[in-house]
Amino acid sequence: MEAQVRIVTRPERDRLGEGPVWVPERGRLFWVDIEAPALRWLDLASDETGTRPFPEPIGWIIPRAGRRDFVIGLKSGFALFDLEADHVTPIGNPEPDCPDNRLNDAKVDSAGRIWAGSMHQPETAVSGALHRLDPDLTWRRMDGAYGVANGPTFSRDGRILYHSDSAARTVFAFDLAADGTLTGKREFLRFPEAWGWPDGMTTDADGCIWIAHWGAGRISRLDPEGCLLRAIALPATNITSCAFAGPELDRLFVTSASRGVEHEPSAGALFELDVGVTGLPPRAFGG
């Protein structure tokens, strides 16, 4: 089937839109513009949008289970954010020895832990890493030597973590144990040049992986073995991430970036797609 694509009407374009996350308790899709920098949101019932500027790059936002506030990934590190009080409380910086790095993308596993990647802001050093933030607000470095650590997602049963190094055009798979240990790092998929660079990912209810293609103007659906099932072209070159949203989890939202392609009318837009499949329920941070 052909995907129905809608461009969400709003007053701004994102310079680097990323990290869409559905928060059903609020009826909102949240995402970030890392380079504005700003937090964005869309009310799915009213189609109204909102924004909250930040004084430093913000890489992602994740709700906390049973609470009204969020965890966010800033250039300065992990922090708690209360939207209503408009207050940020720092947790800590997982990379104090890498002042040019910033947190880039994150997801929550079935145990309520956040898995967050980092990257070198000028993208000239292989100093990115993969960190795990536990519900007790302590963190641990789990893997390293990434150019641009990006797009974590999980298998349907939660036993495999998928994580990419965009700079290397490679998506890796890890075995994820119940205690949060990673083993068996392996290449899941290497992008050919025509595919651009792998960016954000999400998993659907069938266990298939949806992945954004930076530089190639599309998203793709892959089976759990990494075989291409479907590719959907979008009217923007730099596609950054995707997430299922809505009460039925049947609306796929896709972020994009206008950086470097400002001449493209739809670059930096938020797209909504009807792709005929549903997503997995979103997870909140357990701490």
Name these PLM-found stretches.
Residues 86-142:
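Hydrophobic alpha-helical segments and helix pairs
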Residues 169-170, 174, 190-227:
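Loop/turn-rich, solvent-exposed surfaces of beta-rich toroidal or solenoidal domains
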Residues 11-26, 55-73, 97-113, 143-160, ...:
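Beta-rich, blade/repeat-based domains predominating
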Residues 4-10, 47-53, 89-96, 137-144, ...:
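A short beta-strand motif characteristic of beta-propeller blades
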Residues 174-181, 274-280:
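Short loop/turn segments immediately following beta-strands, especially the blade-tip
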Residues 243-287:
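Blade-level signature of beta-propeller repeat domains, shared across WD40, Kelch, NHL, RCC1
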Residues 23-24, 29-35, 71-76, 114-124, ...:
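Conserved beta-strand positions in repeat-built beta-propeller and related beta-rich domains
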Residues 38-40, 77-79, 128-131, 170-172, ...:
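A short loop-to-beta-strand structural motif that recurs across blades of beta-propeller domains
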